UniProtKB/Swiss-Prot annotation:
Natural source organism: Lactiplantibacillus plantarum (strain ATCC BAA-793 / NCIMB 8826 / WCFS1) (Lactobacillus plantarum)
Assembly description: Part of the 50S ribosomal subunit.
Family, as annotated: Belongs to the universal ribosomal protein uL22 family.
Protein name: Large ribosomal subunit protein uL22
Task of the protein: This protein binds specifically to 23S rRNA; its binding is stimulated by other ribosomal proteins, e.g. L4, L17, and L20. It is important during the early stages of 50S assembly. It makes multiple contacts with different domains of the 23S rRNA in the assembled 50S subunit and ribosome. The globular domain of the protein is located near the polypeptide exit tunnel on the outside of the subunit, while an extended beta-hairpin is found that lines the wall of the exit tunnel in the center of the 70S ribosome.
Gene Ontology cellular component list: cytosolic large ribosomal subunit
UniProt xrefs under NCBIfam families: rplV_bact
Record's keyword terms, sorted: Ribonucleoprotein, Ribosomal protein, RNA-binding, rRNA-binding
Entry's Gene Ontology BP terms: translation
Keyword Membrane set for record: no
PROSITE patterns found in the cross-reference section: RIBOSOMAL_L22
GO MF annotation terms: rRNA binding; structural constituent of ribosome
CDD domains on file: Ribosomal_L22
């Protein structure tokens, strides 16, 4: 007997924003309904908001297309951010020296579940 799937997931990997900054946005939508989460993301003035919104819409699309779940019944059940690979660069400094610049990336994962 086939088990009824009630959740869908979407992931964005190696996004060029530090995980610490993305977590500030992701913490706002965890546990909210999809409609409420999209409204919050639309009016949150942070650089990570459009990226998180895109991942959320992808998770909703996965739920609708792959598992025939209804958009109005979906809730953001799980949302987390992990650190991705760090791009290491160097900035020239005085007297011929250089200092390291770490360009941090992150992996964003959002899971939506039916109420």
């Amino acid at each position: 007997m086939a088990e009824q799937v009630t959740s869908a997931r979407a992931t964005a990997k190696t996004v060029r924003i530090a995980a610490r900054k993305v977590r500030l946005v992701v913490d706002l939508i965890r546990g909210k309904s999809v409609a409420e989460a999209l409204a919050i993301l639309k009016f949150t003035p942070r650089g990570a908001s459009p990226v998180v919104e895109k991942v959320l819409l992808s998770a909703v699309a996965n739920a609708e297309n792959n598992f025939d779940l209804d958009r109005e019944d979906l809730v953001v059940s799980e949302a987390f951010v992990n650190e991705g690979p760090t791009l290491k660069r160097f900035r020239p400094r005085a007297k011929g020296s250089a200092s390291p610049i770490n360009k941090r990336t992150s992996h964003i994962t959002i899971t939506v579940t039916e109420k």
